[in-house]
């Protein structure tokens, strides 16, 4: 990762801490996601919840090494504007496709298959996002869902679903605010 991108990420960390509407993942979660993408060889990433693009930059920095792309979905116009500016500053515009809309409506319209999915949006809707995207995930795709410890009660249906689903193997990673990591085995 180039120094300018590291500086941008640090700037976005401070911005996120000072602006409640921008809930960025912690840096250790970003690093963990980056490592997962690199070692898995993921080439097509689906991100639900772009916010200001902080997590997207972590994902895009990793997937560009795999010669891949991030498709990210965000509904809020003001967040989209910030994210686009940040992608340009990170020189990652060609690696990221940002789609405006409600993920519940956008996911069914997506073409192609994904190797990696990161969910960090409306907690109660995580299960909807996964069910809608499931057929678009390749075998051995990784699904990561943020806030599995911090918002465990809001995510209880999602957590029960991924932990009991016959086509998934799932584990809680106690990093940041908790990351539920699932592998699509079927």
Q: For each of these PLM feature ranges, what is it?
A:
Residues 1-116, 123-144, 148-186:
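A short alpha-helical cap/connector motif
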